[in-house]
Structure formats: C-alpha cells, structure tokens
C-alpha cells in the first residue's frame, strides 16, 4: 500500500475528483485538527493506495486564503499526520525559463527562499533541519518520466524562487532572482519545503508554469499578469499532475 499527501492550490480544485474517477475509488472528506487551526482534506482511496489531498488555500465557495495568509504549519502538520511515504507539492509558478513555457510542468530541484518570515515547528527549542537536498531524486525522476509521456520535453532540476505575494513580482525583481539562480517564481513552495524537511518526510515538487514571469513574455515584455488567466492555465495541467500521482503510487 502506498500513501501520498498532496499539497496543491491554484488550478487544482478538481484534482480529488479526477483521481476519484478511477474504478473502485472511494472518497472521504475530513478536517484535521492542529494547534494552528483545522485543515480541510480529501482522502482518495484506490485499491490499497491512499492519497490525502490538501488545498493549501482552504478554498470554499466564498473565500480563498491568499498566499501570504496561508498557515503552512497547519497544512504540513495535517499532511504529516497521515504518515505518508511522500509529500507532493504542486505549485503554480511564473517562468523565466524558455524550456518551461506556460502550460507545461517541470520538476523542482531546489528552492531559493530569502523571505524574512521564518517557518518552523520549533519556536521554543533550536532545531536545525538539513536542506541540502530538498527534494527526493528518485521521486523526481518518476514524475519526470510520467511527464515525458504526457507532454514530451520536461524541464527538471529547476530552482524555485519564493516570493511572499499576494502581488505578482516586478520585472526588476525577476531579473534579480534569475541572477541568483532561479528558473521560476512562486508564492508557496518555500515554507512547505522548510516544514516538510523538519518533519523528515520525502518531498517532491511539481512546478506548473501558469504564466511568463513579469517582463518575460516573448515579444511583449509589458504584458500584464492576471490571476484568472493564471488559474485557468494551471487547470489545463491537472490531468498531467494526476498521471504523476498515479506513477508515484505504482
């Protein structure tokens, strides 16, 4: 039996329904208690495998927690309480990498997180988690192979820059991040990678290119970034994400 916890957000609201469409699948919704608040989650069981899906934004019909307001400790605590073999983060990003145009999915290898806010489970006792290899190479390779079957070329080994949001970045910020080694930029993976490392769980991250980063749209460097368009683009990649989940379970 395989158990995977999935942390997802933009464009992935129907991921649980997609996985639940498999023959014999069962779906249960639940709320996981934590000292940082309750976390809504969906458990999808297929044969002997289980996938716990957590919408990091805790979206419902009336509201959606903005990226800077997400309580990542609650989400990662809920994921860890499931005792998964692996945590899969699915992150919508802006791309500054020609090999990762909007509509394609890449595989993260590292995080560039210089945000000032600390994220830790250990506020009262100094505990230092190693982050030399944030993401499991074996699981990353499984995802890359699954993506090759669905989209062909796959950008892997990507460095994900963390920005706090909720505003999109400026072209100058993107230029600076690229000089520091970033390939893509997002608003959620940095805290998740820190907290998953503290819990000692294997981690893999898919980056869904939903837009060109600010100032990087080919032929139109002044093109604006619109969240509705970003969300719609992310949703087009949901089936490929589902194939990665299936590959990780096998």
Predicted features and spans:
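Alpha-helix C-terminal capping segments
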Residues: 78-83, 99, 180, 194-202
